[in-house]
Structure formats: structure tokens, C-alpha cells
């Protein structure tokens, strides 16, 4: 029952994220990412079905993988367009569809894909056929190729672009570890299978991606802004990553941040000195109590009557 609850929760999280990206942000460059999140959500929901009693385990085990068969193509398309700022070539789309996606869908309900499946000790077990292994290998290759593309793009980018790439690469690696470990490695080693953890792990991966994609990209946050919002845990993480991956941009952003602070303090001090009846010490105290002089315009003290 715990597995079902976790899978359904993962499904809801992915679906919400996917629908938000597609229907709220409506940015074409993130369309593949949004569709990928929705497929993760459907995958997680379908993964829960075989755990219910009196279900056709072999049928649902084959069915639950269907949303993920096209996922490698979407991943490659998204990473390529994200890094190089241009659409994935039509020829590349056709090759992946003809060589990978269509053959697997064609044999997805045959013994060449999954031969048998059963629930034992609250875990889903199945016997994989040659096309299932082909499916997993293709997924792993798409992840590896995406990481290579990110590395190439990382070298050419600066500032928060590098921070974004770190989040996306971390999410992809987490995806690789989750799927590779819980759907492939444990099975080949003959160890107890916990393959229901794979979609849960992928949910964490998309959450990591969303920090770099939604939290930064969709709101176009600059290096300076993450310094100004350093009380946020995500902003703290962004600052640490930026400091490591691009020290030059970090120093420039820090310089601009300090310059802005000094300018605001001087402006606030001057305004209070002219428009209020406070002494110098009272102005210092007031600025100190208001976050180092960052006073919203409407909170200025009026001159005493």
C-alpha cells in the first residue's frame, strides 16, 4: 500500500509540473520538457496498477512502460534545443522514431518485450525480452548523449547558464541512476527488485530540473537577483553553484550587488535627512532596523509637523 501511495503522489507531482509548463508558461522551448513530465506522471500512475489485487499483471506491466518508450526522443530533443537554441533536426527525429520508438511500440504487447510478470513480497517482478532490453539501452544512450551535449554547452556558457546546466545534468544523472539501478542492474544481479522506486526517483529528477528551468529560466533571474534573494534556500544553492562553476561572473555579480546596496543606503540616508526631522544617529538606527537601508519607498518617515 505504501508503494501505491508513493507512486500516485509522484504521478500528481509530475502531472502538475507538466501542465504548468505547457499551459501556464506556454513557452515553446520547454514544450518537450512539459510533455516529458506528463509522461512521467502517467508512468507513475500506471506503475501502481499491478499492485492492486485481481489485475492482469502481465498486461499492466507491459502497459506501464508505454509512456516511457518515447521519453528518450523527447529528452534528446529538449536538451539539444535548450543547449544550442535551435530545434532538433528532422532527420534525427525520423531516425529515432524508425529505429527505436516504432519497433518497440510494435512489439510492446508480445513476449519479445516482456514474457511474464508477477507480484511477490509487494514487489513487481518480470521476465524481460530482447525488446525491453533494447528499450532500456536506448534510454541509457539518450541520457549519456544528453550529458555530453550539456558538457559541450557548459564550456560555451557563462553565469547562470552554467548553473542551469548543473541542475539539468544533476537531474539527468539522478534519472540514470534511478532507472538503471532499479529496473536493470538489480535484475541482472539477481537481487531483490524495487523497480517501483524508479518512477519516484524520476520525480525527484524532474524536481531538480525544474529548479534550473522554471525557477531561473521562466522568470529570467540574473546573477544579481539571486544575490538579492539570498534568504531563499534555492538562491543559496544557486550562489554556491555559481561561485564554483563561474567565479568571474560571481565576483561581477557580487560587485554589482554591493554597489546597489551602497547606492540605496546613500539614497535612503539623503531622503531621510531632507524629508524627516531625525538626527543622524536616529537615521542610522532606522536604516539598521530596516535591513541595512533597503527601505521600501512607501515606508519613508514624513517630516514631523
Task: Go through each PLM region and give its residues.
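Juxtamembrane "helix-exit" motif on the non-cytosolic side of transmembrane helices
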Residues: 46-56, 108-122, 180-190
Amino acid at each position: 500500500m505504501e508503494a501505491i501511495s508513493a507512486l500516485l503522489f509522484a504521478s500528481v507531482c509530475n502531472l502538475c509540473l507538466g501542465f504548468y509548463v505547457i499551459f501556464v508558461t506556454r513557452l515553446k522551448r520547454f514544450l518537450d520538457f512539459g510533455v516529458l513530465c506528463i509522461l512521467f506522471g502517467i508512468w507513475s500512475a500506471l506503475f501502481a496498477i499491478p499492485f492492486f489485487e485481481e489485475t492482469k499483471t502481465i498486461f499492466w506491466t507491459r502497459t506501464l512502460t508505454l509512456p516511457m518508450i518515447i521519453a528518450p526522443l523527447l529528452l534528446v530533443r529538449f536538451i539539444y534545443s535548450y543547449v544550442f537554441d535551435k530545434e532538433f533536426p528532422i532527420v534525427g527525429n525520423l531516425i529515432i522514431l524508425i529505429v527505436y520508438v516504432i519497433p518497440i511500440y510494435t512489439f510492446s504487447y508480445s513476449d519479445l518485450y516482456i514474457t511474464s510478470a508477477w507480484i511477490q513480497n509487494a514487489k513487481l517482478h518480470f521476465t524481460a525480452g530482447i525488446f525491453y532490453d533494447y528499450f532500456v539501452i536506448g534510454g541509457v544512450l539518450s541520457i549519456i548523449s544528453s550529458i555530453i551535449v550539456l558538457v559541450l554547452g557548459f564550456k560555451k556558457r557563462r553565469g547562470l547558464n552554467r548553473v542551469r546546466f548543473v541542475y539539468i545534468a544533476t537531474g539527468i544523472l539522478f534519472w540514470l541512476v534511478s532507472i538503471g539501478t532499479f529496473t536493470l542492474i538489480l535484475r541482472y544481479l539477481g537481487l531483490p527488485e524495487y523497480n517501483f522506486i524508479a518512477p519516484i526517483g524520476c520525480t525527484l529528477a524532474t524536481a531538480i530540473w525544474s529548479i534550473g528551468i522554471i525557477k531561473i529560466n521562466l522568470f529570467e533571474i540574473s546573477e544579481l537577483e539571486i544575490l538579492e534573494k539570498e534568504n531563499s534556500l534555492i538562491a543559496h544553492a544557486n550562489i554556491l553553484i555559481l561561485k564554483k562553476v563561474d567565479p568571474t561572473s560571481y565576483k561581477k555579480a557580487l560587485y554589482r550587488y554591493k554597489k546597489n546596496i551602497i547606492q540605496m543606503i546613500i539614497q535612503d540616508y539623503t531622503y531621510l535627512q531632507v524629508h524627516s526631522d531625525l538626527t543622524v544617529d536616529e537615521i542610522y538606527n532606522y536604516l539598521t532596523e530596516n535591513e541595512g537601508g533597503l527601505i521600501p519607498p512607501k515606508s519613508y518617515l514624513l517630516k514631523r509637523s
